[in-house]
Amino acid sequence: MAKASQVVLSENEFYLIKAPNGKVLEVKNFNTENGAAIRLWDYAGHPWQQWKFVDAGEGRWRIQNRFTGKMIDLALGGVVEGTWLHQWGRTSGLSQCWALEPTRGGRTRIRNVLADKYIDLVGMNTSNGAQAQIWTYVSGGNQEWDLERVDSNAQQTRAKVEEVHDPEPT
């Protein structure tokens, strides 16, 4: 386990990667294919909005989606500002390795090891659908994230409640 901001990460847990406005990173349209975009969206309890931090050694992490099992990666292995984030099956490449850096405000900056740039949002947009990208460090909230553990009991309870309220097929 390693500490990032105020969150102790465990490989056995899933986390939300939350922007300061409460929206989370997710796989666009719950797409399971390599190359599916990573974007910002309102949290709705879906597994494509949940992430596992997999220890990659040397203080590095791979970030794996709960629904697809794929890793956050740099599109086309790009390292320049504005390179979009997408998901890809696990590789040994550093484009899937991330370092977690705590901020003074208790949030976390997530830096790609290969590019030495941070997870950011295109145009500093914080609305639903904003594309995630990498960018050189700036001292703004658009590069700061809350890593919030998903409560598995709450997830199971929510699923059971939804199941009870689903109408029977006719």
Residues of each region from the PLM?
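IQ-motif-like calmodulin-binding regions
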Residues: G129
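Ordered, small/hydrophobic-rich secondary-structure cores
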Residues: T83, S92, R104-G105
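Surface-exposed turn/loop modules enriched in turn-prone residues
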Residues: G35-P47, Q87-T91, T136-G140
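Generic preference for hydrophobic/aromatic residues in regular secondary structure cores
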Residues: I17, I38, D42, I63, ...
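Extended, hydrophobic interaction surfaces within ordered domains
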Residues: Q133-I134, S139, W145-D146
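Extracellular glycan-recognition/adhesion modules and their associated mucin-like linkers
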Residues: M1-T32, Q50-V79, C97-T126, E144-T170
